[in-house]
C-alpha cells in the first residue's frame, strides 16, 4: 500500500535525485538523434509567473518526450541580464539609502549590481526546478558571463568590420527618467483622455489668412519645420509651397504636400516636427527638411535649438524663445498654450482620447528624441567575412526572410508567418546602444579628435589608432543584442564544437507572439549570418495566460496568480496581501480584495506541480490565449489523486500474486474481452498521444490521457477487473492481474512528460512488478510504442455491448429515481447469449442479480428499456402515492427555476447587453433545467398510467 498522495514530499525527493544523477545532461553520443531546445532566458530580476509555467511545461514536456524516445537531449537554460530592469532594481535600493549611481561612479555601481545578482538573481531558476524543468543546469548561462561577453564583443567587431554596424543620429524612443533609449517592446501605449489644440498658422505674405493645425503636443511646436497637406486636398493646393509664420517664434516654415496626411482627419493640416515624432521624421526625410531638436535629454526646453540634416550633420543653430528655456516639456506646454491664447493663435481646445507611449519600467511619457546612437544595418549587404552557406551575401533582413520563405524555419501555427513577414518588410535599422551602465559596454574607443576605433580590447584599439589615451564608449548594448546570440553563444561558437554539430539548429523554439520581431527574427539574422545555419527548425507560438475573465494578468491590477502558490498553497490572508500590494491604482484595493475572496474563499489549497503542469498542458492549443480557470487545476489535482488511488488498487490485488511476470513465468492465458479491450485502448492512446506530442498539441495529449486514465482504465476497466478477480477462474484472475500491471506501467510512461513527479514515484514501484524496470528512472525508460497487431476488433465490439447494457440499466434507475442504496433484480429478454455480459452488471449497477429470461415477467410498474435488441426490466416495488408526491414537488421546484430563468432571458436588451459568457451560461442552465423537467414529467406519466 502507498501512503496518502502528498505532492510536496515526492516532488522535492525526485527532483533532487534527478539533478544529482545527471539525468538532464546529454551523453553527447553523436550517433544518436539529437533534440535540443533553448529556454527564452527570463530576466535575472524576475520571479516565475503563469506565462513561464505555461511556456516551460511545453518545453519540458517536449524534452522529456524526446529523451524517452532515445534522443540525445539538451534543454539549455539561462537568464538575461535585463539591462534596464536590473539597473532600476539596484538604483531603487541605493535611493532608499539616499545614494545615487552617480555618487558611486560606474565601477562601484557595477560592483553593487553584481553583488545583487549573486544574492537575488537565482530565484527564477530555483522556481523552474519547482515546476519540474529537466533543463541541463550544467550548461546554465548568464547573458553577461565571461563566455557570452567574449561572444558579444566578437560579433560586434565582426559586424562593424563587415560594414553592418555604424554610429549615427536617429530618432529613438527616449525615457527621460532613465536617461536612455528604449526598445519598442519596453514602451506601453496607454489610453488617456487628453486634448486636441487647434492653432492658427498665418500665411507669411498675408497674415490675415491662416491654416488651422490640430495637435496633441503643442510643446513641440518650437521644432516644426513645415505644415503638410494632402496633394489631393483642393482646400489647400493653392497654398503648397507658400510660407507660414510659426506661432510664438517668428520663424517661417513652408507648406508641403505629402500623402501621409489624411484629408478627412482633423483639419487636413499636419505640423511636421521630424526631431520629435516618428511619422514626421519619415515625412521630413522624404522632403529633405531640417531636424530641429528643442529638448535636452531630461525633456526640458533648450535655450538654443540643435539643428541637423538627415545625414546627421550639424546645421546652423538658432535661439528658442527665452521664456521657455529650461522648462520641463509639460510646464512648457502649459505656458505655450497660455501664450497662444493671449496672442490670438489658439482657435479651440477639444477633448480627445489618445494613446500615450509610456516606459514600462518608469511610467514616464516616452519622448521621440534625436540622439547619436549605434545601429545595426538591416538592409545593407556585408563586405565579406561570412561562412559559406545559402545565406551568404544577403543582408541580415534578407537572411531572416529567406530562412522562413524556404521552409528552413517553420512557424506553428502557420498564420504567424504573415505577422513575421509584415514586420520584416517594414524593418528599420536596429538601434543597439543604451545610455545605461549595466550591460555589455560597446567595444569602441575615441581619440581627442572624435575618431572611433572598434576593437576586441583597448590594446587592439590603441594599435589601430597608433596612440594611447583613448576613451571608451560609455553606452552599453541593447539587452536583445546578447539574447539574439544565444543559439550559438551557448554552444561554443566561434570554435567548432561537438555541441554546435549536435544541437544547432535546435528543434524548436517555444515562445510568445509578442517577441517574434524583437527576439525570434534577430536570432534568425545573427545565427544564419555567423554560422550559415538557422537557429531552430520550428517556432511554436503559444498564447498569453490571462485571468478567468480574459484580462491580462498584472501585479498592478491585482489579478495575478503565482504558480508557486498553486503548487504549495497559500492561505487567504497572505493571498490578499500579495494581491493588494503594488496596485497601479491603490484605491482599487477593496475591489481587488472582494474579487479575491469570492474567487478563493479559503485561499488556494496545495495543488502540486503535476496538477499545475497538466492544467497548462490542457490549455496548450495552437496560438490561442488562455483564460486560467482555478477549478480546472483543482480537477487535475483530483486526476492525480485518481491515478494514485488506482495504483493502490492495482498493488493491493497484485503484490505477492502470480501476475505472469518474472524470469520463469509463462504468458497468461484466458484473457477476457475487457482485458483485450483495455490493451486495445492503450495502443490507440499511445498512437494518439505520440501524434499529439510530435505536433505540439499538448492539449490533445492531455485530453486523450485524461480520458484514457479516468474513463477507460479507472471507471471501466478497474471496475470490471474487480468482478474478474472475485468471480473468475485462476487463469482468468492471473490474466487480469497481468493486464492491470502492464497497462498501468505503460500509462505512467505515457503520462510522464506532462506529470513527471507522480509518475516517477509510482513507476518505481509498479515497473519492477511487470519486468519493465529497464532504467533507473522513468525519464530514461523508453516511451511506449503502439502494437497494432494486438488490436482485437471483437473485444471492442463486445465492450461496446457491455457499456450499452450498463448505460441502459443506469438510465432505468435514473428515470425511476431509484436511490443508489436500493438494489433490484434485472431481467434481460434476448435471443442472444448474454452470459459474458450479465455477470458484470450487478456490481457495476447496484443490482441484486442480473439474469437472462425468455420473456420478461408481468409487472405494470417496472420500467423497461431496449438495448441492442434486448429488453431490460428492473423489478422494483414502488409506493405510487409517495413517489408521485416526491416527483410533483420536484417538478414544482424546477418550474419556479425555469420561470425565473426564462424571465431573465426574456428581459428586453439582456441578451444583447450582458457579457456573452453570462448569457451562454444562462442558456446552458435553461437547457439543463428543461432536460430535468422532461425526465420528471416522464416518470410522473408512467406512474399515472
Swiss-Prot record:
Catalysis performed (reactions): tRNA(Val) + L-valine + ATP = L-valyl-tRNA(Val) + AMP + diphosphate
Origin: domain of life: Bacteria
SUPFAM superfamilies in the cross-refs: Anticodon-binding domain of a subclass of class I aminoacyl-tRNA synthetases (SSF47323), Nucleotidylyl transferase (SSF52374), tRNA-binding arm (SSF46589), ValRS/IleRS/LeuRS editing domain (SSF50677)
Major localization listed first in the record, in broad terms: cytoplasm
Recorded coiled-coil stretches: 879-945
EC number of this enzyme: 6.1.1.9
Keyword flag Ligase: yes
Binding site for ATP: 555
Motif 'KMSKS' region, residue range(s) on this chain: 552-556
GO BP: valyl-tRNA aminoacylation
Gene Ontology CC: cytosol
Protein's job: Catalyzes the attachment of valine to tRNA(Val). As ValRS can inadvertently accommodate and process structurally similar amino acids such as threonine, to avoid such errors, it has a 'posttransfer' editing activity that hydrolyzes mischarged Thr-tRNA(Val) in a tRNA-dependent manner.
Quaternary context: Monomer.
Protein's name in the database: Valine--tRNA ligase
Gene source species: Neisseria meningitidis serogroup A / serotype 4A (strain DSM 15465 / Z2491)
Amino acid at each position: 500500500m502507498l501512503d496518502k498522495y502528498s505532492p510536496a514530499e515526492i516532488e522535492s525527493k525526485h527532483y533532487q535525485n534527478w539533478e544529482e544523477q545527471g539525468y538532464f545532461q546529454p551523453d553527447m553520443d553523436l550517433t544518436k538523434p539529437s533534440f535540443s531546445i533553448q529556454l527564452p532566458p527570463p530576466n535575472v530580476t524576475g520571479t516565475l509567473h503563469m506565462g513561464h509555467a505555461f511556456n516551460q511545461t511545453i518545453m519540458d514536456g517536449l524534452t522529456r518526450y524526446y529523451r524517452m524516445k532515445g534522443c540525445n537531449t539538451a534543454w539549455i537554460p539561462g537568464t538575461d541580464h535585463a539591462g534596464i530592469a536590473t539597473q532600476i532594481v539596484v538604483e531603487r535600493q541605493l535611493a532608499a539609502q539616499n545614494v545615487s549611481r552617480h555618487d558611486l561612479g560606474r565601477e562601484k555601481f557595477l560592483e553593487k549590481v553584481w553583488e545583487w545578482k549573486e544574492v537575488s538573481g537565482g530565484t527564477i531558476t530555483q522556481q523552474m526546478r519547482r515546476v519540474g524543468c529537466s533543463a541541463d543546469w550544467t550548461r546554465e548561462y548568464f547573458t553577461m558571463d565571461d563566455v557570452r561577453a567574449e561572444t558579444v564583443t566578437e560579433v560586434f567587431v565582426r559586424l562593424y568590420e563587415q560594414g553592418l554596424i555604424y554610429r549615427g543620429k536617429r530618432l529613438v524612443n527616449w525615457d527621460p527618467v532613465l536617461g536612455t533609449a528604449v526598445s519598442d517592446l519596453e514602451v506601453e501605449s496607454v489610453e488617456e483622455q487628453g486634448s486636441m489644440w487647434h492653432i492658427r498658422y498665418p500665411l507669411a505674405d498675408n497674415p490675415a489668412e491662416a491654416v488651422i493645425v490640430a495637435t496633441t503636443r503643442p510643446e513641440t511646436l518650437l521644432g516644426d519645420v513645415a505644415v503638410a497637406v494632402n496633394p489631393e486636398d483642393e482646400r489647400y493646393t493653392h497654398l503648397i509651397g507658400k510660407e507660414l509664420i510659426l506661432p510664438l517664434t517668428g520663424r517661417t516654415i513652408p507648406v508641403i504636400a505629402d500623402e501621409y496626411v489624411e484629408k478627412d482627419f482633423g483639419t487636413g493640416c499636419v505640423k511636421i516636427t521630424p526631431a520629435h515624432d516618428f511619422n514626421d521624421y519619415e515625412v521630413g526625410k522624404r522632403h529633405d527638411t531640417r531636424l530641429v531638436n528643442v529638448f535636452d535629454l531630461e525633456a526640458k526646453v533648450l535655450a538654443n535649438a540643435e539643428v541637423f540634416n538627415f545625414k546627421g550633420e550639424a546645421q546652423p543653430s538658432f535661439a528658442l524663445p527665452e521664456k521657455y528655456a529650461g522648462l520641463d516639456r509639460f510646464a512648457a506646454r502649459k505656458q505655450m498654450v497660455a501664450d497662444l491664447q493671449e496672442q490670438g493663435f489658439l482657435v479651440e481646445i477639444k477633448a480627445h482620447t489618445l494613446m500615450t507611449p509610456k516606459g514600462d519600467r518608469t511610467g514616464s511619457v516616452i519622448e521621440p528624441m534625436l540622439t547619436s546612437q549605434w545601429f545595426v544595418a538591416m538592409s545593407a549587404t556585408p563586405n565579406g567575412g561570412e561562412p559559406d552557406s545559402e545565406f551568404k551575401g544577403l543582408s541580415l533582413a534578407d537572411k531572416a526572410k529567406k530562412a522562413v520563405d524556404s521552409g528552413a524555419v517553420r512557424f506553428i501555427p502557420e498564420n504567424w508567418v504573415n505577422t513575421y513577414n509584415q514586420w520584416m518588410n517594414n524593418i528599420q535599422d536596429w538601434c543597439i546602444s543604451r545610455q545605461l551602465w549595466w550591460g555589455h559596454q560597446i567595444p569602441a574607443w575615441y581619440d581627442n579628435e572624435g575618431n572611433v576605433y572598434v576593437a576586441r580590447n583597448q590594446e587592439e584599439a590603441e594599435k589601430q589608432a597608433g596612440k594611447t589615451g583613448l576613451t571608451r564608449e560609455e553606452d552599453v548594448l541593447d539587452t536583445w543584442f546578447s539574447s539574439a546570440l544565444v543559439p550559438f553563444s551557448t554552444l561554443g561558437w566561434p570554435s567548432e564544437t561537438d555541441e554546435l554539430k549536435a544541437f544547432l539548429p535546435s528543434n524548436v523554439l517555444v515562445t510568445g507572439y509578442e517577441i517574434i520581431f524583437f527576439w525570434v527574427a534577430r536570432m534568425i539574422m545573427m545565427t544564419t549570418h555567423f554560422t550559415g545555419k538557422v537557429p531552430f527548425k520550428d517556432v511554436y507560438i503559444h498564447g498569453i495566460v490571462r485571468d478567468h475573465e480574459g484580462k491580462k494578468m498584472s501585479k498592478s491590477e491585482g489579478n495575478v496568480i503565482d504558480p508557486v502558490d498553486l503548487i504549495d498553497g497559500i492561505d487567504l490572508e497572505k493571498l490578499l496581501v500579495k494581491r493588494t500590494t503594488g496596485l497601479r491604482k491603490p484605491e482599487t484595493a477593496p475591489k481587488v480584495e472582494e474579487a479575491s475572496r469570492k474567487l478563493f474563499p479559503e485561499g488556494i489549497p496545495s495543488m502540486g506541480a503535476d496538477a499545475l503542469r497538466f492544467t497548462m498542458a490542457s490549455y496548450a492549443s495552437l496560438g490561442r490565449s488562455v483564460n486560467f480557470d482555478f477549478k480546472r487545476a483543482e480537477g487535475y489535482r483530483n486526476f492525480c489523486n485518481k491515478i494514485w488511488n488506482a495504483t493502490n488498487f492495482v498493488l493491493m490485488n497484485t503484490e505477492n500474486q502470480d501476475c505472469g511476470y518474472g524470469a520463469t513465468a509463462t504468458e497468461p492465458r484466458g484473457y477476457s474481452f475487457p482485458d483485450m479491450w483495455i490493451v486495445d485502448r492503450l495502443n490507440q492512446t499511445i498512437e494518439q498521444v505520440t501524434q499529439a506530442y510530435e505536433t505540439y498539441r499538448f492539449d490533445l495529449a492531455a485530453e486523450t490521457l485524461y480520458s484514457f486514465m479516468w474513463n477507460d482504465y479507472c471507471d471501466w476497466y478497474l471496475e470490471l477487473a474487480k468482478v474478474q478477480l472475485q468471480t473468475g477462474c485462476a487463469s482468468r484472475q492471473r490474466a487480469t492481474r497481468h493486464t492491470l500491471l502492464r497497462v498501468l506501467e505503460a500509462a505512467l510512461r505515457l503520462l510522464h512528460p506532462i506529470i513527471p513527479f507522480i509518475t516517477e514515484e509510482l513507476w518505481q514501484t509498479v515497473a519492477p512488478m511487470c519486468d519493465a524496470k529497464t532504467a533507473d528512472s522513468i525519464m530514461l525508460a523508453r516511451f511506449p510504442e503502439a502494437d497494432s497487431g494486438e488490436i482485437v476488433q471483437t473485444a471492442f465490439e463486445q465492450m461496446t455491448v457491455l457499456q450499452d447494457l450498463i448505460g441502459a440499466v443506469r438510465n432505468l434507475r435514473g428515470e425511476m429515481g431509484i436511490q443508489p442504496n436500493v438494489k433490484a433484480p434485472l431481467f434481460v429478454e434476448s435471443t442472444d447469449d448474454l452470459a459474458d455480459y450479465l455477470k458484470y452488471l450487478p456490481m457495476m449497477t447496484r443490482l441484486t442479480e442480473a439474469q437472462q429470461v425468455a420473456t420478461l415477467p408481468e409487472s405494470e410498474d417496472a420500467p423497461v428499456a431496449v438495448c441492442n435488441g434486448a429488453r431490460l426490466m428492473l423489478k422494483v416495488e414502488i409506493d405510487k402515492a409517495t413517489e408521485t408526491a416526491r416527483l410533483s414537488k420536484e417538478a414544482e421546484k424546477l418550474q419556479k427555476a425555469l420561470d425565473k430563468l426564462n424571465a431573465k432571458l426574456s428581459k428586453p436588451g439582456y441578451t444583447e447587453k450582458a457579457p456573452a459568457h453570462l448569457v451562454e451560461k444562462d442558456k446552458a442552465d435553461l437547457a439543463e433545467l428543461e432536460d430535468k423537467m422532461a425526465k420528471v414529467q416522464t416518470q410522473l406519466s408512467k406512474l399515472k398510467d
